[in-house]
A protein has these predicted regions:
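Phosphate-group recognition and catalysis centered on beta-loop-alpha active-site segments
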Residues: 1-152
Length: 152
């Protein structure tokens, strides 16, 4: 059995935060799942919802989002270099399919053997395997017939 910290160690720290991820690493979790999406200025940020307060994430600059305590994937790798030794599950949120290209660019010179991509968004899943062959992918769904729809 492998233990994955959902949104980092989110029972003690804010979901998808540097501290939540750091604490999950400290506690010895095998992996960490975080939610990622593109913000209005193109950074890959860690946040679950498509909006915060009255701001849509996809239309809001990273500078504004940082005021809410939102971090970027770049910051995770900069501040937590040990993340490369953990399984990292990136749950891709939102509807902006440009996130796939941003992830490809981000991981161009980083190890991806322990990175897994998942999403509820069929459009993202359809292009992810063709657009980005490194790492692995899986679909997150609540509906059993979704798999048949995505593979057709």
């Amino acid at each position: 059995m492998r233990y994955i910290a959902h949104r980092g160690y989110s029972s003690e720290y804010r979901d998808n935060s540097i501290n939540a991820i750091l604490w999950a690493i400290h506690l010895g979790y095998d992996g960490i799942e975080v939610d990622v999406q593109l913000c209005g200025t193109g950074e890959i940020i860690l946040y679950h919802d498509v909006y915060i307060d009255n701001y849509f994430i996809s239309e809001t600059s990273f500078e504004v989002l940082k005021k809410f305590g939102i971090c970027s994937l770049q910051e995770v790798y900069d501040k937590l270099p040990k993340i490369i030794y953990k399984d990292l599950i990136l749950d891709i949120k939102g509807n902006n399919i440009e996130v796939v290209g941003a992830l490809e660019k981000f991981y161009m010179r980083r190890p991806t053997e322990r990175v897994t991509f998942c999403s509820f968004n069929r459009r993202i899943l359809k292009i992810l395997p063709d657009y980005y062959k490194k790492g692995s992918t899986f679909e997150t769904t609540f509906h059993p017939r979704e798999y048949d729809m995505i593979t057709q």
